[in-house]
């Protein structure tokens, strides 16, 4: 699942050219906390403003888009709070993907979370408008 998402987002990112995809990156957020996400995406223009040291370490910014994967071992309440924290710190779009049940919860700045039950495709908007994740490969 993880590798498929990284592969699809990576291909789209390269073709689109507006951003940088980062895997397993930690961020120092505006509220002072440090958060990591297995998959994140940042507009290139925002990355360009960071010092070289920050680009190689923990950037002091919130990514524009993140993807979190919920496993059977994760605490759902904790991950929902984490998603809310991402949004509160400036992430524009966040996807929480669950494999059992097959569900994607989409978080957007200034909007209520949107829950998609067993979607066939999840379409990006905002910073990743044009990105589409076909879920058949993700669900396995």
Where on the chain are the PLM-derived regions?
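Gly/Pro/Ser/Thr-rich low-complexity, intrinsically disordered segments predominantly at protein N-termini
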Residues: 1-140
